[in-house]
A protein has these predicted regions:
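Hydrophobic membrane-embedded alpha-helices
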Residues: 5, 16-32, 36-66, 74-80, ...
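Mature N-terminal segment immediately following signal peptide/propeptide cleavage
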Residues: 10-11, 16
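Short, Lys/Arg-rich, polar N-terminal cytosolic tail immediately upstream
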Residues: 1-8
């Protein structure tokens, strides 16, 4: 398999967008009616759309890295392309909201990004998720969702080196080991009395979704390509559905651990 465009990935990306959008528009606490109860909890499942984004990102980035592994300027090309793709929009938003907007904002109208402005250093340094998780507080207002961008950026910093120095099979093993580590770390964190928000946003706790995508990308580049994964996917689908149903209907996860 090469880095050619896969239309199916656009459908997955669209599904992830739909899930997150539904989650944002879910109802508040229901009034006791059974259909409101189910409706609210089904839409709450849209939170898993972020995990789906992570899986897709891990798949795409790992594919790009593996396919360009023999390039002369492997690291330079990757980081330049990522920077040109991400930084102009990301830092453009921060400049607009924290530098330009305060200059022109009317003094008699409340500034809408005051909370985030006080903590903007975390935004400039891609540390939103660390601040949120450590203090157990969604404290960035309209910028709270930037936590997921921070997780991906941290992944981009370390994963290119892993792909460069490891064989395909070794990299797949790393995906499995550290994916399991992320799961166990979330459980251990809560078992040891850690706050409930950190497992949702801390970078080490979120690597399993990214590594699932990375593992799939590496497996797809082995003998048989994506077709070799079809039997495993047929088994995984009902298993995943069975794990999600309790959350959809009862709002209860099997392992009762965030993002697990």
């Amino acid at each position: 398999m090469t880095g050619s465009h896969l239309p199916a990935l656009d459908a997955i990306r669209g599904l992830a967008i739909l899930l997150v959008t539904l989650y944002r528009f879910r109802l508040g606490p229901d009034d006791g009616m059974w259909f409101e109860h189910v409706y609210t909890h089904v839409l709450s499942l849209g939170e898993r759309g972020v995990d789906l984004f992570f899986v897709l990102s891990g798949f795409l980035i790992t594919g790009i890295l593996f396919d360009s592994k023999s390039d002369r300027h492997y690291f330079r090309n990757f980081y330049m392309r990522r920077s040109l793709r991400i930084f102009p929009l990301y830092y453009g938003v921060l400049l607009g909201c924290f530098v330009i907007l305060p200059i022109v904002w009317p003094a008699n109208i409340q500034y809408p990004f005051a909370d985030a402005r006080e903590l903007q250093n975390w935004l400039w340094l891609y540390g939103v998720n660390m601040r949120v998780g450590w203090h157990n507080d969604w404290c960035f207002g309209s910028f709270n969702h930037f936590w997921s961008l921070a997780v991906e950026e941290h992944f981009y910093l370390i994963w290119p080196l892993a792909i460069f120095v490891l064989s395909r099979r070794s990299a797949m093993n790393v995906c499995v080991v550290f994916g399991i580590f992320a799961l166990v770390a979330r459980i251990a964190w809560l078992a040891l009395g850690g706050n409930g928000l950190a497992p949702e946003v801390f970078t080490p706790f979120q690597f399993d979704a990214l590594l699932i995508g990375a593992w799939l990308a590496l497996a797809a580049r082995g003998p048989g390509g994506l077709a070799a994964l079809v039997p495993a996917c047929r088994l995984a689908f009902p298993l995943c559905l069975g794990l999600l149903l309790p959350e959809m209907v009862l709002h209860q996860r099997w392992l009762t651990v965030p993002s697990t």
